[in-house]
């Protein structure tokens, strides 16, 4: 609805194939208006200086190594973390990321190493355990991942898919403003967590 040339998104506007055209679908709106979309999804998650670097920096964690490597690219990080327990790290994530709710297990467990993976990273639990992490911090964690983590001696912090990736907007907007002073960059007002909690 605004005058722009490009929409830059983390999640692709067309994430799965379109089976029907719905008038309010963002892909339909963009196509009808002749607008362009550029999505930086898995490539930004895995890139050096990308999503997981930004997430670790916000949490005050320094990456030591990739949490999981595939095809020469890393996914998530293992970070050293001394003098904090799981509950304290969960609270830090809630405060720094602006989460309304953070779910976690094993709150009193002391942390020496933490696995960090933005978005939906429950699949990184085995890698976190294998790298000696006491906790995995990610989003979209299913109940069975919490149970598996407990059985492996690894706590899990679920700070939410939206909140562990929403950091993309401010980061990319800031980078674009710094590199292109004449470029108008706006963060969409529709960029919000639509999930309600009671």
Predicted regions mapped to residue ranges:
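Active-site catalytic microenvironments in core metabolic enzymes, especially phosphate/sugar-handling
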Residues: 1-198
């Amino acid at each position: 609805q605004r005058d722009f040339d490009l929409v830059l998104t983390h999640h692709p506007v067309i994430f799965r194939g379109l089976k029907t055209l719905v008038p309010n679908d963002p892909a339909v709106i963009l196509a009808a208006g002749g607008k362009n979309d550029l999505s930086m999804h898995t490539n930004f998650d895995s890139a050096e200086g990308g999503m997981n670097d930004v997430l670790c920096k916000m949490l005050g964690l320094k990456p030591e190594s990739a949490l999981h490597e595939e095809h020469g690219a890393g996914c998530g990080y293992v970070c050293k973390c001394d003098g904090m327990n799981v509950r304290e790290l969960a609270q830090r994530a809630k405060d720094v990321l602006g989460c309304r709710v953070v779910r976690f297990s094993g709150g009193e467990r002391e942390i020496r190493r933490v696995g960090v993976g933005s978005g939906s990273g429950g699949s990184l639990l085995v890698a976190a355990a294998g790298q000696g992490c006491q906790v995995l911090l990610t989003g979209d964690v299913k109940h069975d991942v919490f149970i598996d983590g407990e059985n492996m001696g690894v706590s899990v912090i679920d700070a939410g898919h939206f909140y562990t990736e929403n950091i993309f907007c401010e980061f990319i907007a800031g980078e674009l403003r710094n590199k292109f002073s004449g470029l108008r960059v706006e963060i969409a007002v529709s960029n919000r967590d639509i999930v309600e909690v009671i």
